[in-house]
Amino acid sequence: MTRGVEASERLIELVRRNDDIANHAAGCDAETVAAAENELGMAFPTSYRLLIKEFGTWDIAGEEFLGVYQTSAMGSKLLGSVAETLDARRRYGMPSDLIAVMFDGMGGLVVLDSSRVDQEGEYPVLVWNPGVADRQSMERLGDDFGSFAFALCQRAVTRWRESD
């Protein structure tokens, strides 16, 4: 098992243990995940795919992740990472090998860079701002989604609990 997948499994446990400050959808089946990857033109890294299958979309202690989900109002349209990635490509010229996974709160997107796959099949986590084409100037937040998301959520839960 990879480091990113182990971290994603720990994040699933963290969300389940803190259900009073977490929300999530029902999760995505294999067909929905495949449709999302097809629309984006690339596969999700394993650590992100695991969380999408488990939760679809989720938030915990104020940290919100796009994930992949559908609503009755929007029908079969895939929302979350799919809709936001396609919108950023169309409206802002986001490179086609990036996948949006969350908003950074300052006008940018936290993205997975599929052009830099590691030996475990994971993509690094970067911040992309509209208009930025140079990868070297993008802030790197982590080596894989699972480790990045678990660390972020663990800190958020600790801060939340300490403020009670």
How does the language model describe each region?
Residues 127-133, 137-149:
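Compact, glycine/acidic-enriched structural inserts
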Residues 1-109, 117, 159-164:
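A surface-exposed partner-binding patch
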Residues 116-122:
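A short alpha->loop->secondary-structure connector
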Residues 143-164:
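Acidic, proline/glycine-rich low-complexity IDRs
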